[in-house]
């Protein structure tokens, strides 16, 4: 069940152990231990900025995807409230987005929840109609974690900027980063959320890309670390582990992606030989999941409760 979490790469665990046991300094300290720790932060920023093709100063480290999502939505809503009070998202977002949007509704913000088509994708025309002069932020997930739908992110970003260049575009890429090539500047993305444990990195660490033109207000206060935007002593082992995992994944991305696509096709061919089975979320004229996430397949079995099937597979060492 690699959509829920992933096994940490041994190389990542080894690097983190070295930092925790040897290079354990506080990166804000001026002595040698602090300088050594700060080098790992620099390595992480350089690595992740290169992968995303962004500037190092545009990256903030968080405690995970949920905090990144909260910081993006609440921080931008607070910082841009004088421009408007309207937000847009979709009906199939992760709870980290949906629950945050519901909280913002209690604070006086209006939220539009876009429907999706039978394949789980938004319709750009719905987005166009939902946009108003009061829209300050749009948040759309890159990859749906249940059916593997890939949203038309680049097209949505272009549409948003065409209609109102000041409207911010946030993308929850927790399920997409490491499995797709994502370039925020090319795709008109202002804010991007990433999680370490979804890419064979550690739990408890995440990333938020914040474009340099974005006004955002901190939601965590303290010692002023990370440009006064996210206070707290940086989780150096976790941050370095996140960067190492991303570096490893993207160093052989094309081969891994091709292998996953082949596995997905083989799996779909196999389950279609069974009776009363439906593969969900397939695009028209794409019988083997083309145009959807290579690492996710959603299957329904008529007359079988999902929990019963889950435990039956669990007995065979298969976790879904």
Residue spans for each PLM region:
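Pyridoxal 5′-phosphate
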Residues: 2-320
């Amino acid at each position: 069940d690699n959509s829920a979490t992933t096994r940490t790469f041994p190389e990542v665990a080894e690097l983190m152990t070295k930092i925790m046991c040897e290079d354990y300094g506080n990166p804000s300290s001026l002595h040698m231990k602090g300088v050594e720790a700060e080098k790992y932060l620099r390595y992480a920023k350089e690595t992740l900025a290169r992968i995303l093709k962004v500037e190092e100063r545009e990256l903030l480290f968080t405690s995970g995807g949920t905090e990144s999502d909260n910081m993006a939505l609440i921080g931008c809503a607070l910082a841009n409230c004088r421009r408007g009070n309207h937000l847009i998202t979709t009906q199939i977002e992760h709870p980290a987005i949906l629950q945050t949007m519901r909280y913002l509704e209690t604070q006086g913000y209006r939220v539009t929840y876009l429907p999706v088509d039978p394949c789980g994708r938004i319709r750009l025309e719905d987005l166009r109609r939902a946009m108003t002069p009061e829209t300050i932020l749009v948040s759309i997930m890159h990859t749906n974690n249940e059916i593997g739908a890939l949203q038309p992110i680049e097209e949505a970003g272009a549409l948003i900027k065409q209609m109102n260049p000041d409207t911010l575009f946030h993308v929850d890429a927790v399920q997409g980063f490491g499995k797709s090539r994502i370039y925020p500047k090319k795709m008109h993305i202002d804010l991007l959320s990433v999680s370490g444990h979804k890419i064979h990195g550690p739990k408890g660490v995440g990333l938020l890309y914040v474009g340099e033109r974005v006004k955002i207000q901190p939601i965590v206060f303290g010692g002023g670390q990370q440009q006064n935007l996210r206070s707290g002593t940086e989780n150096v082992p976790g941050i370095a582990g996140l960067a190492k995992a991303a570096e490893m994944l993207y160093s052989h991305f094309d081969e891994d992606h091709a292998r996953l696509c082949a596995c997905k096709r083989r799996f779909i061919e196999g389950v279609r030989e069974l009776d009363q089975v439906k593969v969900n979320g397939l695009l028209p004229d794409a019988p083997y999941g083309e145009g959807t996430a290579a690492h996710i397949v959603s299957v329904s079995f008529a007359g079988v409760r999902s929990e019963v099937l889950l435990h039956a597979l669990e007995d065979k060492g298969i976790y879904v």
